[in-house]
Amino acid sequence: TFYASIDHVHADAMFMVALFVEIYQNYSALGEGGAPIKLPDPGRYLDYCTRQREYTSALTLESPVVVEWLDFLRRNGGTLPTFPLPLGGSDIPCTGDLITVKLMDSHDSDRFEAVCAQSGVRFLGGVFACAAIAERELAGVDTYQVITPTTTRSSPAEFMTTGWFTGIVPISVPVEGMSFNQVARAAQAAFDSGMHLANVPIERVLELAASLPGISKPGPGVPMLSYLDIGLPPLNPVVMGQWQDRNGTLYTDLGAANQIGMWVNRRDTGTTVTVAYPDNAVARESVAQYVDMMKVVFLRAAEGRADSVSSPRIPRATV
C-alpha cells in the first residue's frame, strides 16, 4: 500500500491525480520485470511563482483583467457570490462535512454529452447550465454567479511539477426564461471568455481595490463549482478507470468549511457531485435540496426535456 500525505496548500488536485498515475505506472512496470518509467523532467515552482509575482505586481486598477474582476464583484454586491440557500449562522463555529451523490450513470452521461454537443457546448458548459437552472428553480436567481477553479499549468514541465498551479474563473450566466440549450451556451461562453482571469488572483484584485467604495472581501458561503473528466488528457483514463479497483482513496480534513465547494466528476461509471459544506443542520438540509435539484435538472437534460426554465419555487434566501 502506498500513502501520500500532502497539505493542499502545496499541491493542487492535478498534481495529486498525476501522483497516483505515476505510482501506478511505475509499480506495474516493476511488477512485470521492467525498468522504472522514464518521467519527463519537472519544472521549478519557484520559476512559476516569480513569473506570476512579476505579472501581478504590474497590475493596476486600470488593467483590463482587474476591471473584469471588479465588474464581476459589483454584480455580486461588491464581493464574491454567496450560496443561494441558508447555511446557518456563521457566528457558530463548526467543522465541515462532505456528501457525494451520483447525478447520472454512464448511459445518461453519454446522452447528456450528446445534448451538450447538439447545443454547441462541451460537457462543462452543460454542468454550469444545470447548476444555474437548479438555482433558478430553488431560489429564483435571474443570473447564476459562481467561481470555478482551473489549472494554470502551461507547459509539459509544469504538469510534472509539485505546486499550486490553480486559479479561479468568474462565471455569470443569465438564466431567467431561457432553455437549457441557451443557458449552456451562455455558460460555455462565460467560461471560455474568462479563462485568462485565472492568472489574476482575486486576493490581488481586492488588494488593489482596498480603497474603492463598495468593494469588500468575501464572507462565508462563497460557492465554487469544479468539473473534471478523468477520461480526458492530461489524465490517463486507463489508469484512473482502475482507481476504485485498486482501492484508491482520498482522505480529506475539511476543518472549518465556511464555503460551499462542489466537484462534479465524470468517469466511466457515470457522473457524481461531491459537496463540502458547514456541518450544521441548516446547511445540511440546503445542500441536500440543492443536490437533489441538480440531479433532476441533469436527468431532465439528458432525456431531452430541457425546455424553458421553470418559474422559481421559493424566494432567494439570505445567507
What are these regions (language model features)?
Residues 32-42, 144-145, 306-311:
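Short, glycine/acidic-rich hinge or "gate" loops at secondary-structure transitions
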Residues 38, 57, 135-203, 213, ...:
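Acyl-thioester-dependent acyl-group transfer interface
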Residues 41-97:
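Short amphipathic alpha-helices and their capping loops
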Residues 9, 22-33, 71-79, 172, ...:
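Phosphate/oxyanion-binding loops and surfaces in catalytic or ligand/nucleic-acid-binding neighborhoods
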Residues 1-5, 61, 88-155, 166-167, ...:
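Gly/Ser/Thr-rich phosphate-binding loops and adjoining beta-strand/alpha-helix segments
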Residues 1-46, 286-300:
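Active-site-proximal acidic secondary-structure segment that organizes catalysis
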Residues 16-17, 95-111, 253-267, 306-319:
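AMP-binding/adenylate-forming domain of the ANL superfamily
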